[in-house]
Amino acid sequence: MKEKVVLAYSGGLDTSIIIPWLKENYDLDVIAVCVNVGQGDDMDYVKTKAIKSGASKIYVEDVKEEFVVDYLYKAIKSEALYEQDYMLGTSFARPLMAKKLVEIAHKEQAKYICHGCTGKGNDQVRFEVGVKAQDPTIKIIAPWRIWDIKSREDAIDYAKKVGVEVPVTKKKIYSVDRNLWHVSHEGGDLEDLKNEHKEDMYFMVTPPEKAKDEPTYLEIYFEKGAPVKINGEFLNPVDIIDKLNTIGGENGIGIADIIENRLVGMKSRGIYETPAGTLLYAAHKKLESVTLDKYTYQYKKLVSAQYGELVYNGLWFTALREAIDAFVDKTQENVTGTVKLKLYKGNIKPCSVDTEYALYDEGISSFGESELYSHKDAEGFINLFGLPCKIKALKNF
């Protein structure tokens, strides 16, 4: 009996040609695994294609709700970003995929896990560190670090040679990653920084100048930091993301053209569509500004940056990530309420916040007198607060 390899399978260019390559070079029984995180593919077609390409078996794991509840809700609560811009759509999906690959490898008693990540990218790190953290005995096969194929053009030529159909041409050669949270576009003419990216590549977002000519008002209700209602309607987690993707997309919201510093050293350019995430982060940030005290709010910004870097670097299965999640959950205890947004041609304007946990007090914050605060109190505070500056000035006077 042949030994088994579990392949992270998408049906795209790289994983389509890996099946015949594995059989040709390793003589392994290939078990394909497609983890459905909302990439929008025809899963019946993916199943058929995997078998036609030479896989002995194909698993399609629908984990969309798990992806939202156990991963994206953590993104929203933490407002995690990498380098202040990237909303980590790929990064949050990879640990869940790694988890499912290991589960199926155990079920199939497979000694190997294979992925189609490029040797220059971050995903190879995320997959392999994720696998090692769960089962250090599983061996990894990474074709892009081994085979003679050096470019996506070479990969297309190899696909034609072995008779594997691929949904990519040499004319339009973007590498696309899609899930519930985002769509990313890399490669092709994007690699020349002098090129403006082409708006016809968008999957989810209408270009802002072509978006609706009238504003859209949107209400999002959060409960302990997680979104549960849209415009007053309770929705399940997956439907919330889908609905916000639609609303944000038709209003031209959620496009980012980013130059990022990859974990492996080089810079890369990506075009990201994240309409739901952009709306949720904007609303969540507004609600936190009202419900968190000053020091928690400011410290959480530091933690959010660290959290984003951890997730980006593939360190999901770590004690630090779990500890940060525990801290974030504590901060979210009173992050409950409704935020109203006004959307227009790529812009988001927060309109109002309605929450019983507001730390904002109109009476204290107004310019008039208050039982808790007198204008006269400011004089003593200023004298003490400014004392170090005054002493230094006196010494140097």
UniProtKB/Swiss-Prot annotation:
Associated pathway: Amino-acid biosynthesis; L-arginine biosynthesis; L-arginine from L-ornithine and carbamoyl phosphate: step 2/3
GO cellular component: cytoplasm
UniProt-listed Enzyme Commission number(s): 6.3.4.5
Pfam families for this protein: Arginosuc_syn_C (PF20979), Arginosuc_synth (PF00764)
One BP term from GO: argininosuccinate metabolic process
Residues holding L-aspartate: T118, N122, D123
Presence of keyword Oxidoreductase: no
Entries under InterPro entries matching the protein: Arginosuc_syn_C, Arginosuc_syn_N, Arginosuc_synth, Arginosuc_synth_CS, Arginosuc_synth_type_1_subfam, AS_cat/multimer_dom_body, Rossmann-like_a/b/a_fold
Annotated keywords: Amino-acid biosynthesis, Arginine biosynthesis, ATP-binding, Cytoplasm, Ligase, Nucleotide-binding
Keyword GTP-binding: no
Organism superkingdom: Bacteria
PROSITE patterns xrefs: ARGININOSUCCIN_SYN_1, ARGININOSUCCIN_SYN_2
Cellular localization per UniProt: Cytoplasm
Binding site for L-citrulline: Y86, S91, N122, R126, S175, S184, E260, Y272
Entry binding sites for ATP: A8, Y9, S10, G11, G12, L13, D14, T15, S16, G116
Complex and partners: Homotetramer.
Family the UniProt entry places it in: Belongs to the argininosuccinate synthase family. Type 1 subfamily.
Stated name of the protein: Argininosuccinate synthase
Species per Swiss-Prot/TrEMBL record: Clostridium botulinum (strain Okra / Type B1)
